């Protein structure tokens, strides 16, 4: 798998945004990705030094539409901790255009 196939998207929640102050970034990753693959992908794409990777599998939630029910997609979430001397990852543009 290539690096851009492993990292799918950043997770933007209150908890993940609070973790960015401590250089902890949260990403949705491919279901088959390992910790080593996630570490190498983040280092390759963003040019930073990764210290630790925590991965969790998130089950799909039960959703209903009338009498029909199904599950949302399951996903795999990776929390990546960067080294203290590493640069921050810019996930958002700082364009303040009106």
Curated annotation (Swiss-Prot):
Record keywords:
Ribonucleoprotein, Ribosomal protein, RNA-binding, rRNA-binding
Q: Name one GO molecular function term.
A: rRNA binding
Gene Ontology BP terms:
translation
What residue ranges are annotated as transmembrane? Answer: none
Coiled-coil region list? none
Q: Which HAMAP family match?
A: Ribosomal_uL23_B (MF_01369_B)
What is the protein name stated in its UniProt record?
Large ribosomal subunit protein uL23
This chain's source organism reads Limosilactobacillus reuteri (strain DSM 20016)
Tell me the name of the encoding gene. Answer: rplW
